[in-house]
């Protein structure tokens, strides 16, 4: 990792070696957290806090994942109000958090690791929104909990588990939340407003396709960027206005003419045996 002053263009810190490349900044633009990767095992196992006023050799260790079956990452909430340390193994996860404007505080545990319990955390206002498989929810569900006491005994489901629908992802925005769902092999993007007045899927064309959310770092926006491709549509990047429900094509891959018209493609279902 390198630290660069964006105003002067000066690199103000020498490279920090053996990191995963991920980092999360506090709101003071002075402290950030980064992940140390063991150079032998390549396991992400430690989180350090850096202060740009001091050499990185003095960075304090804030978390050490000692269980060799787990790796870790550090991330920010979409609102930039919270910083998370995520511990995860094949079937189990665990998340800690602090407020971004309190970088020297101790990370608090949301829910201690329990074998088989997987969860990921988003934040909106004074609640965490958690995609999880609690109570044998193998397709996952979404729960809500107050930040003041976020242990799973207080989780309240806001999107129930469904046996035929897999919840894959959750994106949080100021006015909307977007759920990536998969049903019968096809992905759908569900858009819901926080006030409950809107609940709809982004419209798509075609019998078979692939749709996915792209990088959407902005919290205060009504625009969702996503990718789409199908047998009839080349790989495309689109921007969807969640208020007006209009699509705007930003980029599309050029495809050479193969003398096959789009109407010549169709989906055929086959029963597995």
Regions found by a protein language model. Give the residues of each.
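Generic long, charged, amphipathic alpha-helical segments
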Residues: 152-173
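A short loop-to-beta-strand structural motif that recurs across blades of beta-propeller domains
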Residues: 2, 46-48, 94-96, 141-143, ...
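Surface loop/turn motifs at the tips and blade-to-blade linkers of beta-strand repeat domains
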Residues: 14-18, 63-67, 110-114, 158-163, ...
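Short loop/turn segments that connect beta-strands within beta-propeller blades
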Residues: 5-9, 51-55, 99-103, 146-150, ...
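Beta-strand C-termini and the immediately following turn/loop, strongest in propeller blades
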Residues: 33-41, 51, 84-90, 98-100, ...
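Asp-box/WD-like beta-propeller blade repeats and closely related beta-sheet repeat scaffolds
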Residues: 2-41, 45-48, 57-64
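Extended catalytic-interface subdomain
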Residues: 34, 42-98
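Non-catalytic accessory segments flanking enzyme active sites
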Residues: 71-123, 169, 189, 196-273
């Amino acid at each position: 990792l390198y630290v660069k002053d964006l105003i002067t263009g000066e690199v103000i810190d020498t490279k920090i070696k053996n990191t995963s490349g991920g980092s999360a900044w506090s709101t003071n633009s002075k402290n950030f957290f980064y992940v140390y990767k063991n150079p032998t095992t390549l396991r992400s196992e430690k989180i350090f806090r850096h202060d740009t006023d001091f050499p990185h050799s003095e960075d304090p260790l804030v978390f050490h994942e000692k269980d060799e079956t787990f790796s870790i990452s550090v991330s920010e909430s979409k609102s930039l109000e919270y910083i998370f340390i995520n511990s995860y193994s094949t079937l189990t996860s665990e998340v800690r958090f602090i407020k971004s404007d309190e970088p020297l505080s101790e990370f608090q545990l949301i829910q201690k690791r329990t074998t088989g319990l997987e969860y990921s955390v988003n934040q909106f206002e004074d609640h965490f929104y958690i995609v999880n498989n609690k109570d044998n929810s193998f397709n996952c569900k979404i729960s809500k909990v107050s930040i003041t006491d976020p242990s799973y005994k207080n989780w309240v489901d806001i999107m129930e588990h469904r046996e035929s629908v897999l919840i894959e992802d959750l994106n949080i925005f100021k006015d909307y939340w977007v759920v990536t769902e998969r049903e019968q092999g096809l992905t759908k993007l569900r858009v819901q407003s926080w006030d409950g007045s809107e609940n709809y899927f982004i419209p798509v064309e075609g019998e078979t396709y692939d749709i996915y959310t792209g990088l959407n770092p902005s919290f205060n926006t009504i625009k969702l960027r996503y990718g789409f491709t199908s047998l009839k549509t080349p790989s495309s990047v689109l921007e969807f206005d969640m208020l007006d429900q209009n699509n705007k094509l930003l980029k599309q891959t050029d495809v050479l003419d193969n003398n096959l018209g789009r109407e010549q493609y169709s989906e055929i279902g086959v029963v597995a045996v």
